[in-house]
């Protein structure tokens, strides 16, 4: 029986809000093994997304039941060909911002990925499976996480990244009280300072 189930692992200790992506591609050992790294709006692999709020540890999503809400590229979810494919699930985590103007907004918090969800630490993904799409049960678990590529030391925050100064480039991070008060969430400006050659 054909089904697509995506599970939130019990190890997740918080409510999950965000965009779930279901990614498919032809098996190809010459490409990146992670399907999410093949996503591109130019010539990348097909992917399909639907937003969820309030997912909890242990929840299981029946993707076929969500078919009417799924948006896809470059074709519709129901047009995925029934044949041998590689599949993967990816979850873009959203943070909840309760702004001072009374509005509630959800969005991906940048942890140094530069706005690129494929590189943003703490987003979740599953193993890649090779399946006979349309003819078998597919089960994926979001049990992998994009790791922070450095140790977060005392006093550091992930927002705007944490870059090591170079001889002629200095990195500055400034906490904005005005933006933090508005978003009800700590907000920072980041800046790069290029020093002239032979600067002492």
Residue ranges and their predicted role:
Residues 1-8, 12-21, 190-191:
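Contiguous beta-strand segments within globular domains
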Residues 4-13, 26-35, 178-179, 195-199:
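Short amphipathic, basic-aromatic surface patches that mediate peripheral association
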Residues 11, 135-200:
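N-terminal cap/lid segment of alpha/beta-hydrolase-fold proteins
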Residues 21-52, 56-58:
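Contiguous segments within soluble domain cores/interaction surfaces
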Residues 29-31, 91-112:
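Short acidic/polar inter-strand loop motif in beta-rich domains
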Residues 52-78:
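A beta-strand/beta-hairpin structural motif
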Residues 78-94:
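A short tyrosine-centered beta-strand micro-motif
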Residues 107, 114-148:
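Short Trp-Ser/Thr-centered turn/loop motifs at beta-strand boundaries
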């Amino acid at each position: 029986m054909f089904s697509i189930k995506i599970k939130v692992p019990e190890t997740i200790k918080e409510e999950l809000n965000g965009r779930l992506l279901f990614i498919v591609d032809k098996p190809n050992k010459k490409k990146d093994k992670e399907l999410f790294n093949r996503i591109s709006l130019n010539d990348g692999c097909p992917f399909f997304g639907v937003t969820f709020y309030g997912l909890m540890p242990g929840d299981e999503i029946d993707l076929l039941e969500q078919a009417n809400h799924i948006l896809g590229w470059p074709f519709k979810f129901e047009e995925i060909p029934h044949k041998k494919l590689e599949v993967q699930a990816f979850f873009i985590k959203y943070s909840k911002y309760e702004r001072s103007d009374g509005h509630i907004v959800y969005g991906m918090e940048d942890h140094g990925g530069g706005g690129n969800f494929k590189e943003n630490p703490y987003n979740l993904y599953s193993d890649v499976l090779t399946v006979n799409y349309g003819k078998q049960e597919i089960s994926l678990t979001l049990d992998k996480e994009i790791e922070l590529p450095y140790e977060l030391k005392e006093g550091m925050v992930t927002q705007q990244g944490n870059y090591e100064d170079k001889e002629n480039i200095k990195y500055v991070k400034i906490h904005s009280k005005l933006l933090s008060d508005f978003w009800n969430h700590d907000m920072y400006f980041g800046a790069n300072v290029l020093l002239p050659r032979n600067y002492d």
